[in-house]
Amino acid sequence: MFTNIFFNILAAVVFLFIFWKKLKEDYIPNQIFSAAFSAILGVLLANILIFNFFPSWWFWASLIGFCAGLTISIYRFKLRFFEVLDSSVIAALPWLLIIFLVNSVAFASTSSLVASVFILLLISIYLFSDAHYRKFTWYKSGRIGFSGLTVVGLFFLTRSLVALAFDNVLSFVGKTEIYFSTTLAIVSFFAIYSLSKKEI
């Protein structure tokens, strides 16, 4: 228990730093950290509410709480949605990485180790696309949001494909996982298509 608390605190600190670093050029620290803490608070509250009833739904509860916290901050501080999306995705990936790594060590879980490698791959994809997406000829608008949406789309597409074969992976909720993850993957890729057509 104490190990989980320690590594979650560490992950939260990493999340806060990356989130601040990505947004510090456009927003004041008060806005950035208020949004970040709102997201973290949303995750905590969602997990507290669901822990005694549906503990296996911790990932989806965390995602809903996280998004709710950010959404409130976006409206409160008039933040730009896709800037926040991009920043929150790359800030949250290390948190997921730490969760899977800790689980792989604590329970000798091969699936969690594979998930850790996958998260590292997503981080690499994000960093590459963030550096080069404005050069993609088909992405004419050059609008921010491409990197975050690409990673989100790939993340949930992969979850849906894995859920077709396995349902005992950490954070999965059986075959229901397929429908939720597929929907979010489709929405993400459609959002990329829509963004590519818009002028800056």
Model features per residue range: what roles?
Residues 1-12, 49-67, 110-121, 179-183:
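Structural signature of hydrophobic alpha-helical transmembrane segments
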Residues 5-25:
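N-terminal signal-anchor/start-transfer transmembrane helix
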Residues 21-22, 48-53, 99-107, 158-169:
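Juxtamembrane "helix-exit" motif on the non-cytosolic side of transmembrane helices
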Residues 23-29, 33-36:
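Hydrophobic/aromatic interaction determinants used to assemble and anchor large protein complexes
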Residues 35-47, 89-105, 143-159:
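Small-residue-rich segments of transmembrane alpha-helices in multi-pass membrane proteins
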Residues 39-82:
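A glycine-rich, hydrophobic loop/mini-helix early in the fold
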Residues 65-140:
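Membrane-proximal helix-loop-helix units in multi-pass membrane proteins
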Residues 108-200:
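C-terminal membrane-adjacent module
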